[in-house]
Amino acid sequence: MNKTLTTLFALAVASVTAFSHAQEAKGDVEAGKQKIAMCIGCHGIPGYQASFPEVHRVPMISGQNAKYIAAALVAYQKGERKHPTMRGIATSLSEQDIADMAAYYEQHGKKGADLPAKPSREPSVQVAELLKKGACVSCHGDNFAKPIDPSYPKIAGQHSDYLFVALKAYKADARNPNLGRSNAIMGGISKQFTNAELKALANYIGSIDGDLQVVPQSRFR
């Protein structure tokens, strides 16, 4: 592992430790079920697309790690993730709301046999080199569905267009008040790649089997 990736891995461990200390609220699945009406309007509609900062399918969050969902919502609250709709929603939530909603979505994923330890399909030679360069498995796991810590996302099978938009957001200039995601780890990694390379990574990771899914739901229950 080169010096840059070694430094980023150290930052990853430090950030996980810091977040685990900060997160104290315990999530309640049943309470979360009563709080997700605002989420269903986008994340509960198969194929639903957002238009900011460009058109892409909204991420699948059913089956995602609760700690990651909570961390993402806190990042929107703080403005570390820049998205007008998500910031407006996140700032309306209490710490307990976030914990409850995250707990609900974590158990809402695909059911059945465990995923294999390795991805369901092999990458091309080009993509394999890109994955190695980014050391993606170091945090997201060998099959991209079992990250080293639950405050990191499962990305296997996630919508490829969403992954591409997210990766580009990490590359964005941190001084831009309207666009981007502030994350030292992912920022350092994503800036090593061209947008074409990021798209190739996103297309591969989005094509493999994962736990995530969209569960169609009505807001009127």
Regions found by a protein language model. Name each.
Residues 23, 45, 89, 142, ...:
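Residue-level hotspots at or immediately adjacent to binding/recognition sites across diverse folds
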Residues 46-53, 79-82, 107-125, 129, ...:
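Inter-heme linker and motif-flanking segments adjacent to c-type heme-binding CXXCH motifs
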Residues 91-114, 188-217:
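C-terminal capping alpha-helices of c-type cytochrome domains
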